[in-house]
Amino acid sequence: MFTFLIPFLAKCTTNKWKRACQILEETLRSACNQTDQRFRVLIICHEVPDVSFDKQKCEFIQVNLPIIYPLTASPAQQMIFMQRSDKGRKILAGIKESRRNSSHYFMVLDADDLVSSNLVSYCLNQQNPNGYFINRGYRNDAQLPGYLFQRKNFYHECGSSFILNPYRAPYPDTNIDLTKETGENYFVRRYVVHAYVPSCMEKMGFPLQPIPFPAAIYRFHDSNIYATTLRPPDSALRRYGRLLLKGKKITHQLRTEFTIPPSM
């Protein structure tokens, strides 16, 4: 069994709740379009989001975790701190659930990204005992609809980039009280600072294998905290230069494989 873990933000941490739910629904459609049906999708959330998608393969795991606010920080830093702490704790709650249900693998899937319909089939048929990481993927810029940009070292850029054996993944030996932990906790931070997951697994003696095809799409849009807070916006000249040099037109085949919505 393959489990997608989707940590979904708390309603009080966003002023774009309706939009976040719409984007989540697009992610669910993508995750559930697998050619191999041996999967399930867990959405770890405070409030069950408003989605109209047929949720046969989806389960909403509600958590009662307080939102932890930093004592002193700028508004932008506060938002980053809150979302990272919230996301990391929800990931740990999801890993616990995937262990309880004896999943072979779990994948942390950000609530706005898309995945290849071939991903579950590849992982379950190859059966690497430790797991995988996505080294090749695509990025979609909302300001340049109709195009994707292929990315190397995809796992450096996007959190939807590792598939792990839940029994070999970093996880506390004893239960930690997630209601008190913040993004500074090692296990909370480990999955949020995603670029280091492959090297961390290798140091533990559980090296990951790269997926040999572009397996996910990182969506870069105005609801993405990295796109709006941590990274200055590209100039129009830079955007269109990248389009000319690196742009890949979204074909019918790509739309089918990743369940790319018409808005992209």
Task: Identify the residue ranges that each predicted region occupies.
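Short, flexible/disordered intra-domain loops and linkers
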Residues: 11-22, 78-81, 178-189
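Conserved catalytic core of nucleotide-sugar-dependent glycosyltransferases
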Residues: 116-185
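Acidic ATP/Mg2+-coordinating residue in the GHKL
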Residues: 45-47
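Short beta-strand-to-loop acidic/aromatic patch adjacent to the donor-nucleotide binding site
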Residues: 102-114
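C-terminal catalytic/acceptor-binding lobe
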Residues: 178-264
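Hydrophobic targeting segments
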Residues: 1-6, 30-31, 39-43
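Short, acidic, metal-binding catalytic loop of nucleotide-sugar glycosyltransferases
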Residues: 21-38
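Active-site-proximal specificity loops/subdomain of glycosyltransferases
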Residues: 49-103
